[in-house]
């Protein structure tokens, strides 16, 4: 199934990293480190702030998942492209499609050939989540349980 049959495909609209003061909104760029976030900014009036769940694809073709508000880099040839679901999706499903994009299409984009809405919208994402042979749900639930237990234990230690 084509990406534009699963997601609304939009170009980011913002300025360069240096144009922003410190704030509370994650600024997402081309880095693969820290889920693409390079700093937290105060958006400018003409910026397009997105609200997740959404997938942000960097100009270099790396997909990251964002569940809350975020500001993707949107100027020049290395702008981000944002995929917002056309229908309600679980976080597992969003994560699945981001990983599928990275495995299937990440190789297509480089410094010489940046990603953009035109290049992304007609790419295929197959198999779709409902036909996937993977069951990430139980693994993610197990990991969440382990982390929750560790966090609660640490919280109790800090109370002492």
Segments and roles (model prediction):
Residues 107:
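Extended, Lys/Arg-rich, non-catalytic nucleic-acid recognition/anchoring regions
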Residues 23-28, 53-55, 79-81, 121:
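Structural beta-strand/beta-sheet cores of well-ordered domains, especially the beta-sheet scaffolds
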Residues 1-7, 28, 80, 94-103:
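Short, structured motif recognition centered on aromatic/hydrophobic residues
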Residues 73-81, 111-135:
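A short glycine-rich beta-alpha junction/loop motif
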Residues 1-13, 17-35, 130-160:
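Non-catalytic DNA-recognition/assembly elements of restriction-modification systems
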Residues 17, 110-111:
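A short, aromatic/hydrophobic, helix- or strand-capping loop or linear motif
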Residues 40-99:
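A short beta-sheet element
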